[in-house]
Amino acid sequence: SVFNNIRIPLLYNKKIKRGEHKERIHRAAESLLIQDKLHRKVEQLSGGERQRVAIARAIVCDQPIILADEPTGSLDAVNRDRVMDILMDLCNEKGKTLIIVTHDTSVAERCDRIIRMKDGQITDRAGE
């Protein structure tokens, strides 16, 4: 279920008590507008909903840094923008640092700083 999928990182975080899991999962799901999907199977969700589940997994432990590897890959333009809006809002509202790996220039353009790499080497920096 979506609930169990979001719970995965909590099971590995020994600092968060099991009694807090349900509340944290519901809070993360609510912030991403997927609270009504918690009892569904992930396979039944749309691509955009699956991306929001992945983001919920990333934020449920409330860490200061979110690492997102191609968070909008395979999404259409509308869902790409929705996912980016959600990620940017989380950073702005909660003071999180977001590190994004992307090949999509429209995603990169929304970032404060950009580091371009080729063959494992930094080739360009912007916004510093």
What are these language model-derived features?
Residues A77-N79:
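Helix N-cap at the start of a conserved alpha-helix in ABC-type nucleotide-binding domains
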Residues E20-L32:
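ABC nucleotide-binding domain "signature" region
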